[in-house]
Amino acid sequence: MRTGPLFDPSFRDGLDALFQWRRDVRHFRKDPIDEETVARLLACADLAPSVGNSQPWRFVRVDDGARRGVIIDDFTRCNAAARALQPEERQDAYARLKLEGLREAPLQLAVFCDEATDQGHGLGQATMPETRRYSVVMAIHTLWLAARARGLGVGWVSVLDPQTVTAALDVPAEWAFVAYLCIGWPREEHPIPELERLGWQSRRPHPVVRR
């Protein structure tokens, strides 16, 4: 006797559409997100798989204006350095990219991995401790899909110095910085990645290696 939900063709089609329309969003409206929705997103993230059921993700909600200012300043510094690393012929194209929504996104989450957690009792981590951080990324992706299903957009800001973020948010030393997420109502929706539309990088078919 079936006890779980029925994932019928209609559901699968909707799920496929969710994957296609999940975008890395940089352009947000400033409309607030209600607290019930925020709580639901974090609850969905907690449903993600994790090595040894360790749930090592730690979400820090960044509301304080001064702390957000530190993040913006750090992005500005890191982005200038990253642009300088590009070949000269690509630097102007890089400068035209909008790589963050730090000034617009109403909800901002810094995501860390608790490298000292005893939850899970180390199961599956002895030979591959990096699976803890992989687990955090799974939680981020789960939250991302949950947000998109509710009409929200998510932008992952990676042009940041982890030590600066960790210090600015005053988190335990055992927490390793993984991601800074900007979340809000997108100004536009598109099934094609912005970097592809701007000519920076198109998607490529995924090769499958068989042995």
Swiss-Prot record:
Keywords: Cobalamin biosynthesis, Flavoprotein, FMN, NAD, NADP, Nucleotide-binding, Oxidoreductase. Homooctamer. Belongs to the BluB family. Disruption phenotype: Cells lacking this gene fail to synthesize cobalamin. The keyword Repeat does not apply. One of its GO terms (molecular function) is nucleotide binding. This is 5,6-dimethylbenzimidazole synthase.
